[in-house]
Swiss-Prot record:
<dbReference type="GO" id="GO:0006412">
    <property type="term" value="P:translation"/>
</dbReference>
<dbReference type="InterPro" id="IPR001706">
    <property type="entry name" value="Ribosomal_bL35"/>
</dbReference>
<keyword id="KW-0689">Ribosomal protein</keyword>
<dbReference type="GO" id="GO:0003735">
    <property type="term" value="F:structural constituent of ribosome"/>
</dbReference>
<protein>
    <recommendedName>
        <fullName>Large ribosomal subunit protein bL35</fullName>
    </recommendedName>
</protein>
<keyword id="KW-0687">Ribonucleoprotein</keyword>
<dbReference type="GO" id="GO:0022625">
    <property type="term" value="C:cytosolic large ribosomal subunit"/>
</dbReference>
<comment type="similarity">
    <text>Belongs to the bacterial ribosomal protein bL35 family.</text>
</comment>
<dbReference type="InterPro" id="IPR018265">
    <property type="entry name" value="Ribosomal_bL35_CS"/>
</dbReference>
<dbReference type="Pfam" id="PF01632">
    <property type="entry name" value="Ribosomal_L35p"/>
</dbReference>
<dbReference type="InterPro" id="IPR037229">
    <property type="entry name" value="Ribosomal_bL35_sf"/>
</dbReference>
<dbReference type="InterPro" id="IPR021137">
    <property type="entry name" value="Ribosomal_bL35-like"/>
</dbReference>
């Protein structure tokens, strides 16, 4: 049976931690930040953990990052 391939788009966007959580960057920061509140901009920094259903989908894209 051939090796399973990792989705290149997923490996660039997500990181699986040692405990199995999937980390991703916050969405909604590409443009239009002038009308956002300062609190939104602060909270949108860094990464966030994905919910369980979303994490299951992303882990399917990356078979060797478990």
């Amino acid at each position: 049976m051939p090796k399973m391939k990792t989705k290149s788009s997923a490996k660039k966007r997500f990181k699986v931690t040692a405990t199995g959580k999937v980390m991703a960057g916050q969405a909604g920061k590409r443009h239009g930040m002038i009308k956002r509140h300062k609190k939104f901009i602060r909270d949108a920094r860094g990464t966030t953990t994905l919910s369980a259903p979303d994490a299951k989908i992303v882990k399917g894209f990356m078979p060797y990052d478990r």
